[in-house]
């Protein structure tokens, strides 16, 4: 089974991202806009309970925090992904580190850059054009975050929530 761990932003932020993703992200229909805490990973069904228990522990050690989303960035030239930048708070960093150490041993492919993808799979010319236009616009959003989600991938490639984890002591 394939799992991933994400934070979903507010509906307002998702709507803004989806307005762009419809045009620039081929994965638009597979998963709602999100901030990835742990990239998708394969696991055996019998490990799911242990993963859920570990995520409850991580959530209980993390205080709710404010998510700051603003400006447009890109991972070019590594890949042509365009995204809304997400401020790297101590809580986001802690969550990401906890999900890549101890119980979770998956190696990182890239350094942790919190972001909300709005375009990917673009040609070099399209990437440059879209990025140039979006960088001229003013984007800034903030919202309180008090939970993250364990997702699993269905056979048709879409992702759905398996369980939600509330941040802070006594919330799980």
From Swiss-Prot:
Active site: 34, 115
Database matches in Gene3D superfamilies: Cyclic phosphodiesterase (3.90.1140.10)
Taxonomic superkingdom: Bacteria
Protein name: Putative phosphoesterase BALH_1087
Family: Belongs to the 2H phosphoesterase superfamily. YjcG family.
Renumbered ranges of motif HXTX 1: 34-37
Motif HXTX 2 boundaries: 115-118
Signal sequence coordinates: none
GO molecular function, a single term: hydrolase activity, acting on ester bonds
Pfam families cross-referenced by the UniProt entry: 2_5_RNA_ligase2
SUPFAM superfamilies: LigT-like
Record key words, sorted: Hydrolase
Annotated EC: 3.1.-.-
Top-level EC class: hydrolase
């Amino acid at each position: 089974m394939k799992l991933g761990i994400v934070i979903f932003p507010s509906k307002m932020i998702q709507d803004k991202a989806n307005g762009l993703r419809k045009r620039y992200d081929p994965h638009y229909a597979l998963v709602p806009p999100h901030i990835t805490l742990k990239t998708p990973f394969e696991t055996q069904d019998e490990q799911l309970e242990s993963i859920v228990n570990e995520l409850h522990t991580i959530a209980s050690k993390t205080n709710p925090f404010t998510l700051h989303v603003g400006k447009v960035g890109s991972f070019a030239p590594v890949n042509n992904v365009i995204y809304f930048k997400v401020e790297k708070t101590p809580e986001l960093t802690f969550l990401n580190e906890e999900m890549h150490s101890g119980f979770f041993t998956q190696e990182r492919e890239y350094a942790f850059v919190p972001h909300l993808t709005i375009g990917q799979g673009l040609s070099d010319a399209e990437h440059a054009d879209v990025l140039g236009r979006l960088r001229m616009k003013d984007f800034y959003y903030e919202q309180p975050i008090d939970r993250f989600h364990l997702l699993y991938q269905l056979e048709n490639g879409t992702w759905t929530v398996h369980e939600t984890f509330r941040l802070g002591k006594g919330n799980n």
